[in-house]
């Protein structure tokens, strides 16, 4: 059985997501990849195997807009030709592939096609008009793809149950979210210039989005006298959607964080915070666990494993008072045992072999 892993996007966490899955099959010569990257060349830098094809497409505003209506013909043609060349039996579309809905459905008539659903529902967001339009069109295309394929994969147990209710006649599969740790992160030791002399901070890491509830932890560190004596670092690109002022104990690094900076950023943090209002799945837990940094996360379904596996504590989603109290409790606690558990959890749950075996079982059903 010849398998093709497809990713046409490396935006946000999709690059690490796809490359980690592809790298899980590094030794399998019957598993190929077909990926499309932009000027960041994420896949070229992180995929270990040469058993595939990498195409290039600029991440311009024009390309983003036109892709909502017309997928690049050259890429569609190349994908179909590659499937024939390698005598592919199974195709797994890893990263939504928003513009390629018709192509995916068409291929599902000739191949065994799997499609990974990342976010079944749109997250809370404050966006300008053209971004709202693009967002709406994107989710419309994703809905078409879900309707048109027979095999759907998700990394969220709650989403798995919802998909089974929505599509009782389809095959719905679950596998654990892969680690977002790549070789650029493990080998990197670049210090963010904004953190000169700053140590033992509480870290929020990730793109700033409304559904991630960043304003909750910001307000907690602004208003509580004890938290005012501690440092909060908010690190990630994206539009700051809430009013923010300059405080000595709050450092905002509002830019893209290079992979080479992530090790320093986490190694010098005391703990990590994820105050999400909603979340179906996320790879951020793998990063905290890899570096052994205790977690404070909201109790939305995906993050409830934090308390279950003793990797930190959960607070009631959207509740600033509960978040504040949990922060104050954990900041004065001995965190060494949690750190050890996190690293053990990472080794047993985020290994490449675990991902490989899970997917092979799915493909063979």
Language-model segment annotations:
Residues 5-6, 70-71, 79-100, 111-114, ...:
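Short N-terminal targeting/anchoring amphipathic segment
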Residues 7-12, 23-70, 97, 159-164, ...:
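N-terminal strand-loop element at the rim of the active site
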Residues 80, 132-152:
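Membrane-proximal helix-turn-helix segments that form the acceptor-binding/catalytic region
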Residues 147-187:
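Donor nucleotide-sugar binding/catalytic pocket of nucleotide-sugar-dependent glycosyltransferases
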Residues 194-212, 218-221, 232:
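Conserved donor-binding/catalytic core segment of Leloir-type glycosyltransferases
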Residues 241-263:
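Nucleotide-activated donor-binding/catalytic signature segment of Leloir-type glycosyltransferases, i.e.
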Residues 252, 309-321, 327-335:
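Conserved acidic donor-binding segment of nucleotide-sugar-dependent glycosyltransferases
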Residues 264-280, 290-293:
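Acidic donor-binding loop of glycosyltransferase active sites
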């Amino acid at each position: 059985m010849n398998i093709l892993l497809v990713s046409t996007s490396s935006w946000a966490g999709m690059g690490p997501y796809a490359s980690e899955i592809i790298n899980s099959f590094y030794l399998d010569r019957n598993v190929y990849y077909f990926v499309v990257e932009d000027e960041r060349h994420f896949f070229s830098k992180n995929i270990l195997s040469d058993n595939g094809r990498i195409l290039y497409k600029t991440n311009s505003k024009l390309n983003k807009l036109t892709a909502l209506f017309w997928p690049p013909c050259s890429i569609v043609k190349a994908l179909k030709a590659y499937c024939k060349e390698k005598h592919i039996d199974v195709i797994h579309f890893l990263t939504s592939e928003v513009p390629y809905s018709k192509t995916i459905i068409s291929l599902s008539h000739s191949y065994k096609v799997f499609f990974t659903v990342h976010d079944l529902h749109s997250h809370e967001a404050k966006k300008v008009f053209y971004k709202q339009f693009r967002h709406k069109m994107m989710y419309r295309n994703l809905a078409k793809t879900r309707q048109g394929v027979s095999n759907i994969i998700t990394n969220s147990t709650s989403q798995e149950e919802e998909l089974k209710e929505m599509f009782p006649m389809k095959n719905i599969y679950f596998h654990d979210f892969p680690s977002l740790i790549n070789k650029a992160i493990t080998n990197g030791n670049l210090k963010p210039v904004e953190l000169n002399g700053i140590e033992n901070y509480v870290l929020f890491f990730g793109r700033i989005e409304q559904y991630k509830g960043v304003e909750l932890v910001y307000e907690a560190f602004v208003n509580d006298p004890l938290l005012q004596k501690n440092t909060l670092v908010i690190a990630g690109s994206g539009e700051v959607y809430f009013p923010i002022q300059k405080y000595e104990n709050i450092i905002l690094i509002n830019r893209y964080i290079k992979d080479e900076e992530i090790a320093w950023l986490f190694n010098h943090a005391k703990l990590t915070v994820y105050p999400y209002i909603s979340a179906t799945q996320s790879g951020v837990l793998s990063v905290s666990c890899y570096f052994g940094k205790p977690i404070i996360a909201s109790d939305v379904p995906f993050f409830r494993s934090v308390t279950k596996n003793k990797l930190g504590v959960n607070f009631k989603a959207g509740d600033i008072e509960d978040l504040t109290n949990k922060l104050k409790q954990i900041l004065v606690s001995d965190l060494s045992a949690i750190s050890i558990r996190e690293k053990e959890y990472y080794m047993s749950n985020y290994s490449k072999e675990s991902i490989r075996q899970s997917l092979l079982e799915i493909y063979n059903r």
